[in-house]
Amino acid sequence: MIRTVIILLLFIKSSFIFSQSYQIGLLKYSGGGDWYANLETSLPNLIKFCNTNFKTSINPEQAIVEVGSVDIFNYPFIHMTGHGNVVFTNQEADNLRKYLLAGGFLHVSDNYGMDKFIRTEL
């Protein structure tokens, strides 16, 4: 009986955790690398694909979050895209480092020519 109750409680708890919705943050950064590239398609398409194929519950409304803001810690997943140059101040780099070390996930989509710039910043 106790075993059944424990299994039932674990099932209820896990179904609650996995049914929660969360929002993905779109990373706003400096350097002229147009962080807003494909604003209307890139992240919305990724969210739609995940919700449809993986049965996730990602909020389709994307939130814009600045790399140096404490708000970055409100998002378990942040998406970064653009073309070309990426520049982080020391404070922004430190904030992003803390976010990643705390378990945050950064998805970098090299939309075109961003690779060599982002590697020096990371």
Describe each region flagged by the PLM.
Residues F18-F77, T81-G84:
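Aromatic-Pro/Gly-enriched surface loop or interdomain linker
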Residues T41-N45, F49, Q91, N95, ...:
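Extracytoplasmic/secreted proteins, especially bacterial periplasmic and envelope-associated proteins
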